[in-house]
């Protein structure tokens, strides 16, 4: 399917808008002036090795058709701003036409091309080439001088506008691509931050669980009271109800061992005491049979 370009020809009355359009479409020059309200033309052509379809709208230049002209401007992709080199007034009108286009399109950058028509009327020139070029530069768009009568730069004007549209669309596409890449980068950065935050949360959760497990282990290894309740001190001992039981058993065993060690010593002391008493009685002349 052919790519279709909607081109709108804008300018004051009598500057040759219809003559340019008919010369492009029908390849002949219309000499008489017939004020146009609106005419639409279509032509298939080849631009930069591509088959395209040009839909050219020739608009009325009179001020009374300004509201109607705005409707055409809304549908246009690119605009030829046409003045006549032998009419200073038509040249000065282009500023208001350009402002109207920007207002209707709600943009400060629209594909346009400034055309100084009737360059064959050099002897009647009121607008210099330099002035036309300066105006185009202020609009940031290309500039051509044309002659519909002599078919000078007619195709170049319309084809140049198509190229301008393509460049404009390419810039828009590139800007959208960069914006999409920036959005993807922002999403990736946000996702990375979310993952980092999740990892920190997981690490904190693992740390808290480890602390809780250590506390539980310390409590289990602590003492148990007589009622089976874990000692809150967590010191590994038992409560006072049973804390002294091993110590008491140990003391009793030690006393038994000491008593057993003391019995032979006591017997030896008793024997020694008996011998002393026997010796004493023998000295006193008494004899005791034991």
From Swiss-Prot:
A biological process term (GO) from this entry: positive regulation of filamentous growth of a population of unicellular organisms in response to biotic stimulus
Which is one Pfam family of this protein?
Ras
- Residues bearing Cysteine methyl ester are 287
Q: Where is the composition biased (Low complexity)?
A: 178-216, 246-283
- Lipid attachment residues per UniProt (S-palmitoyl cysteine): 286
Region feature (Disordered): 176-290
What protein is this chain from?
A: Ras-like protein 1
What is the protein's species of origin?
Candida albicans (strain SC5314 / ATCC MYA-2876) (Yeast)
